Amino acid sequence: MKRNLLFIILLLLLPGLHQVFATSTIKKVAPTFWWAGMKNPELQILLYGDRISSADVSLSADNITLQEVVKQENPNYLVLYLDLSKAAPQNFDIILKQGKKQTKIPYELKQRRPNASAVEGFDSSDVLYLIMPDRFANGNPSNDIIPGMLEGNVDRNEPFARHGGDLKGIENHLDYIADLGVTSIWLNPIQENDMKEGSYHGYAITDYYQVDRRFGSNEEFRKLTQEANAKGLKVVMDMIFNHCGSDNYLFKDMPSKDWFNFEGNYVQTSFKTATQMDPYASDYEKKIAIDGWFTLTMPDFNQRNRHVATYLIQSSIWWIEYAGINGIRQDTHPYADFDMMARWCKAVNEEYPKFNIVGETWLGNNVLISYWQKDSRLAYPKNSNLPTVMDFPLMEEMNKAFDEETTEWNGGLFRLYEYLSQDIVYSHPMSLLTFLDNHDTSRFYRSEADTKNLDRYKQALTFLLTTRGIPQIYYGTEILMAADKANGDGLLRCDFPGGWPNDTKNCFDAANRTPQQNEAFSFMQKLLQWRKGNEVIAKGQLKHFAPNKGVYVYERKYGDKSVVVFLNGNDREQTIDLVPYQEILPASSAFDLLTEKKVELRNELTLPSREIYLLSF
């Protein structure tokens, strides 16, 4: 009888005993690992698991100090701050103790790569090639659909669906990209976007430390970066600190309400970011512009929360250290908190002094954009610490200039002259990202019918690749891909022909391109290969002249070498007097890099309709 009674008591106690000896379920550890020897010795580790906030936390580690344990409103989170100033590479345990229950979380502090802090960023010697990974090439069809992910279909006939492009597809065409002559690739976001729809573009991140499995793995991305670098190509990674995807665990089960603006409640942004530098702006409009959300499915981070700020900053440093990327393009830069973003840029620069960051600064004019660049006189005494900003106004001017007739006072190439004459507003004009189009705008050619006019293409490319700044080319421009934003963003991001195994046309191969496509490709390739390693273009001073008879003339000069460009901005032949240009014409003849012929420069110069001379001295 006593034995039976004891047995019954044990059965009743089993659930409790299970709770005493079981370990907590840890769902996320971010970052997943770190490195010893970083310049900033502080490490934030975010732990996410079932009701872990009541745990006593300790470390089983050598020379690592647990500085702070911060509970959040949500009992499923703990935020740890560690001091690694004396730590060597090691494996250690984070120990959570709740009563008699103990959980050990293994953690690795890795050895840094040799010269990791010396990673070389992109600059005005580079040309970036922008790729939307889902739309470039499908190198691994087996990862098109991943069981359990929310968007479980691939449909190349639907502009807003996933099409199956991936990292392997990009890797397979690195030789094509390098042969074109660009020196860097910028990838639209590759981090996990486990959203129900529209996940192809990547701008609704659900895990900041994980490559989307439909693109590949973290290791595959690191391999892509290494192979690209080996072929002379830098890699720029797209990041988003302003917002995440609504299926991100940080939003679905918020650590605290103040991790997101408006306590996680949807309030639409006004998109009026000019309020941030407007001396007359109301507090209300400033707040709505910056704290408001892009969409219901893109909750807006509160970067004023120190834990959020550190989480985001560390995530970017983790990718630089892990994958060896050469640059970051920060999406919607002015929509995030100014002070936090300035802190981020400074933190990255302190760890990687040669690194570069470009912020998406989509504002209506150069005055507004200049505010966001490092050392801006307009922002003083504040400083964004952002080295490079995107020159959207120049894009707008270029998309008009090469369609119009040029006079001495307006229209056509006068737009470019007048716009560049205002570069005084920029603290670092050579560090502006310049482009004809990108994944958010109409392509430079809006329809296939427009592509018959290659004069427009050739003049625009010549200007883009010889003026000040860091040029960016959107994938497919070299084969005259065309699209109009009026028809929807999905069509701006069409598949590259030949990127999929069953494509009927493969434009990676010259034999399958039309004569016009090959002419366009060859022209771009010639300019890009000439520009590569050209110090005159990378470092040279710019001097220009107001258009005369519709002809725009400018010089790039570095040391005793120079390049002089003549662009005829009219549909008729023009003859110009060369006397006004003698200060930039050191010889009576010069070699034209495009025709590979000598051009006489004695008294006058005649330029046929829409002609280009690219002269080297």
Curated annotation (Swiss-Prot):
Effect of knocking it out? Reduction by 30% of the rate of growth on starch.
Where in the chain is the site Transition state stabilizer?
A: D440
What name does this protein carry?
Neopullulanase SusA
The protein's role, per its UniProt record? Neopullulanase that cleaves 1,4-alpha-glucosidic linkages in starch to produce disaccharides or trisaccharides in starch degradation.
Q: Kindly state what the record says about how the cofactor is bound.
A: Binds 1 Ca(2+) ion per subunit.
Q: Where in the cell is it found?
A: Periplasm
Species lineage, top-down? Bacteria, Pseudomonadati, Bacteroidota, Bacteroidia, Bacteroidales
Q: In which pathway does it act?
A: Glycan degradation; starch degradation
Where does the record locate the signal sequence feature?
Answer: 1-22
**Which catalytic reaction applies to this protein?**
Hydrolysis of pullulan to panose (6-alpha-D-glucosylmaltose)
Which residue positions are annotated as catalytic?
A: D331, E360
Query: Which cofactor(s) does the record list?
Result: Ca(2+)
Mind listing the GO molecular function terms for this protein? metal ion binding; neopullulanase activity
| Annotated positions binding Ca(2+) | N138, N143, D144, G164, D166
List the source organism: Bacteroides thetaiotaomicron (strain ATCC 29148 / DSM 2079 / JCM 5827 / CCUG 10774 / NCTC 10582 / VPI-5482 / E50)
Homology family: Belongs to the glycosyl hydrolase 13 family.
Lineage top rank: taxon: Bacteria
Q: What gene is this protein translated from?
A: susA
Q: Matching SMART domains, A to Z?
A: Aamy
